[in-house]
Amino acid sequence: MQSFLQEVAADLYRRYGEDVSSLHILFPTRRARHFFIDALSHLAERPMWQPRWLTIDDLMQEVSGLHSGERIRLIAELYKVYSACHDEPFDKFYFWGEMLLNDFDTIDKYRIDADVLFRNIYELKELESDVSYLTPEQLEVIRQFWANFTDGATLSEEKRRFLAVWRTLGDVYHGFRARLQRQGIAYGGMMQRAAAERLLAGDFAFAERRRYVVAGFNALSACEKVLFRFLQHNAETDFYWDYDDYYLKNTDQ
């Protein structure tokens, strides 16, 4: 039985032959590329030029104009913003910073309104009545984010600290992003959001004609959906979705 990437390689080689080298092939991760190269090498009758390989982060970086920052540097930059509001040594902040960075990443990838999200936790009912413009996907991200901090009877020390600084998180989020923007670096979600906003504003175009293959994606973030719609309409693009047959054939799912 052929793997998904073997099937993609076989179909592309059948359609393009050695012209497959003219394609830009976009994978979710770099690891998928190695399996695809192995599958393609078994199909080719002689040595051939490889396609151009990209990950989603590579293309988001090109569109956004930002560069991916190393995680330790990102946390250090976050601490500089956070420490302006709260007196806490870096060694105690580090775990907290990891969690905040992950949360900021999710907020941006799903294009969540951070100002709505960071309202006072005790005004949850107000938030619930002010979500008519949000998609079900965005609502679910918000609910998952808030679920960790709403059970006052079982709060851990980390959660208590979160509640104590809740009112400042909006300022920390915006200040952190502005600081990174000035340095031309970003975390993954910030880079994706910047790319999506640039595409939606019509402020980006490829300098040359390109043919893309998007392979191996399934559940997409809001920013990825914007990018793929752009590729669909502004480049010759083939999509190979990696969905489980169970969900495709079972209409109740």
What positions do the PLM features span?
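Conserved RecA-like ASCE P-loop NTPase motor core of nucleic-acid helicases/translocases
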Residues: 19-32, 212
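N- or domain-start disorder-to-order transition segments that initiate the globular core
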Residues: 1-12
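Short glycine-/polar-rich loops that comprise or flank the Walker A/P-loop
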Residues: 20-23, 47-51, 208-210, 234-237
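Basic/charged alpha-beta structural segments of nucleotide/phosphate-handling enzymes
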Residues: 30-206, 222, 244, 249
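Structural beta-sheet core signal
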Residues: 25, 214, 239-241
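Conserved P-loop NTPase "ATPase switch" module shared by AAA+ and STAND
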Residues: 208-220
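Conserved RecA-like helicase ATPase core segment
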Residues: 210, 222-253
